[in-house]
Curated annotation (Swiss-Prot):
This is Cyclic amide hydrolase. Cyclic amide hydrolase of unknown substrate specificity. Catalyzes the hydrolytic ring-opening of a cyclic amide. Does not act on cyanuric acid nor barbituric acid. HAMAP family: Cyc_amidohydrol (MF_01989). The lineage of its organism: Bacteria, Bacillati, Actinomycetota, Actinomycetes, Mycobacteriales. The record marks S306 as: Important for substrate specificity. Homotetramer. It comes from Rhodococcus sp. One of its GO terms (molecular function) is hydrolase activity, acting on carbon-nitrogen (but not peptide) bonds, in cyclic amides. Residues 1-90 are annotated as: RU A. Residues 237-349 are annotated as: RU C.
Amino acid sequence: MTSPEDTAGVEAALAAEGFSPTDVRAVMCMTESDGFGRGYASLAFAHAFAPALGCPPEDVAQQIPMIMIGGCSGLVTPYAAVFVDDPASSWVTDGSGGGLSIGVTTTATLNPLDVGTPAMVDAVADAVRSAMAAAGIDKVADVHNVQIKTPWPSSAALLDGPLSGLDAGSVGAMARAAGALGVAVALGEVSRADITADVFLRDPNLRSDVASVSAGTERVDAAVLVMGNSPTSASPYRIGHGVLRDGIDPHGVLDALRAVGIDSGWPFTADTTPVEHVFLKSAVDGTDECRGRRHVLRTDYLGPYSWLLGKAVVHATVASIVGDPMMQVSGGGEHQGPPGGGTVAVIAR
């Protein structure tokens, strides 16, 4: 993508492969917006897809989840990734396969006062279960990445609610926390009985190792995209995941590679990499040290941008192994992987 509003590459790629927007299941982007919920890539894609879908642009997101991540720090490549249905595919499965499968859904419209609360956890958990069913995934162990875009209500919408008085950044953090805990509950990573209002942003032991949650002002519901492997899928792709213990941990991505059958050959180059896509969630700025050494991500003059700097760190670590800087890198890792680290998922053929 040459800019956040650049949809030409996606439109050309769809046309070249004989697809149209009606075949699109989900869109993900890395854009050079500010990352604070004010990006406009989703609006550009909505206008591009609306004519083919036969609906006004404002309704496109109800048909096609759009998960746009702003902030291309370091060497992160701005790009768009599109998931499509291919009814003409010649791929076959013998039922034993475990090919890549995705399921998409949305929650009902969320009351702004429920955002960042246990009520939102329940709504997201139900949506994750529905998306798993849509993907043909029966076992939670076969789920390797759950992308969620939650609402990011304005301060005015939160008056007299449980988040009243919080600044905009804190509201976004609570929304992401609720989304992540919803995934954790749905997949059995956390017991629902442990979810109370006072654990949000306070108990890092309550977390999901496959969730990747972002928040946006454009949503009034939570969009959910579950990615995993299903024995009913004929896809030649597989997905696996790992956990990054800190920002310079190579073992998380190596675990993800092994999970898709790649046991050797790293570090790869752009010409040799077997990796099709990587999804990273950074929680690098969740602590003030790395392996016992103090760092100043949160305390020097760039402290307000610690989330952005953390993304650059973890991106460099993973890109140096997979051999490609084009990958999704999302900050705001509340309850997503261990503080100071993050999560990674890899799709390979």
